[in-house]
Amino acid sequence: MKMNSGRFLSILSLISLISFSCANQTSTADGDRKNNSSDSIIISEQNVSYSADGITFNGFLAFDSSKTGKRPTILIVHEWWGLTDYTKNRARQLAKLGYVAMAVDMYGNGKIAADPKEAQDLATPFYKDPQLCKTRLDAALSKIKEFAFTDPDKIAAIGYCYGGFVVLNAAKLGADLKGVVSFHGDLSGVAPDKKLLKAKILVCHGGADQFVGPQVVDKFKHQMDSIGADYTFKVYPNATHAFTNPAATELGKKFNMPIAYNAEADKNSWNDMMDFFKKIF
């Protein structure tokens, strides 16, 4: 089903409530630095501030401080609700696997939308001007490279829903990344340019996603194929939009929307991401 951008944003305003609910379920107090130990792994957490265009951004860094030396690094872009604990928990997961992980603040000043209308207002500028995706992600990229344990030649980015749109468009516009992964992300935006696209791409898409329909998927694939892009498009049967989010089922019922958590698709897409990282790093 093909939808115009206004309808897509309106639908996402309800989906964004998933992020809010999930954040409440997984909320933890995190100060400037915190250590979580498990066996020989010591996960250190740190709030990270950086700036661009006169705006201060408040990211979240997680890494295994028991390790030494440089290591592959992953930037994580939040849903359009803002940088909630859901995204931070994904950073923690990656840190436990040995990566440096930084959850990115795309809106600035750690802003989290108070309601769907505010979320739409915050996200709309990126949909209207995808170049903003690259500008903001580049600011985070510059910051993460300042850390001694970051391998500047092994950096990738992943994103969820709105975040998938961000990382895909940043890559298409030439972001200096080894690879990007989109989880149930919007596939619209700028057409890829062979001269600009450096990153390998993995798209994790729900086979039953009614918000990113076949026409959008076909257009994306055609554009990628037309420039010989190095991309992989994974489809998870019966998985709806927001399939990686544990809160999706409850909110789908509440708002009569075709969204649901799919544990199998969540697990399989995560494993596909890990295989992708092994390939690009």
Where would I find each of the regions flagged by the language model?
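Short beta-strand/loop motif that positions the catalytic acidic residue
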Residues: 203-205, 209
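Serine-hydrolase catalytic machinery in alpha/beta-hydrolase-like enzymes
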Residues: 28-42, 47-149, 246-260
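Bacterial signal peptide processing site
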Residues: 23-25
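C-terminal motif of bacterial Sec signal peptides marking the signal peptidase cleavage site
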Residues: 18-21
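Short alpha-helix in the alpha/beta-hydrolase fold that links the catalytic acid
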Residues: 90, 213-223
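C-terminal catalytic histidine-bearing segment of alpha/beta-hydrolase fold enzymes
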Residues: 227-281
